[in-house]
């Protein structure tokens, strides 16, 4: 439970009856997020006949819980299934170059196979969701989300504990920005027209653009950035497209994505010291019950949003935390190096 729009949190564990008790709360407006992981063996034995399944994630959220006196209430949880391929790191803040000028072409996204099985990336897409100032599809939120940009992963097999690194520009950014990083190690590059490119790095196909002029990895430096992984075996250009009400035909058209197709999602909202604007949240609780932020609203801080480590298996394979609750699963770190999971701030507490 957090005071609405902040990161001041209170935690409680439910008893056998599913009751959680919070004591000594200050009168305020709170956001309540609940997460529970039901192991696959336990879930498989709960249904008849027993089945083989991944871990089941139970999540729920109450974003505007007003507590000014003793409160008793119930929260219905939504069920999701833990996925193999997940977001592990998202770097969008940018930094400063050697002349102290804004530098944000070093953005990257990292994916990770969090399972013990090899997975295929066939028909898997990455979508950046719309972030209009006024939410306009609240009533559809449980069934649909809307994408402004969609990228399609080339088909490949990804072994357990391995990553995919996607760069906005797969170049050595430390040449111009000493505080940045070398992204020549990227697996894929979003090759924008008339922008520096690395011919040695494979292109990540940009299969849908809400605006033709936005042909790069279009993450907002300070946030928000809402990202989802989803699987679709057709052409995403054939999916339903909608505009914000009262928009002109020349304005952005967004692709409608059924939430049932989503494999993983992360809400990176814009930081605000007074109150984080939760109206910008786009995903239902079963995809992301909360959010994560940078430490400032303006970005250029050289910070990334990175998933915590849950445990390390005997064979050395890192298992990342995944409860579909970004406040619990991710941290904001000033160590922006990709592909590294030994950072102290990522370790189990």
Predicted regions mapped to residue ranges:
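Short, surface-exposed beta-strand/beta-hairpin micro-motifs centered on an aromatic residue
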Residues: 10-11, 17-24
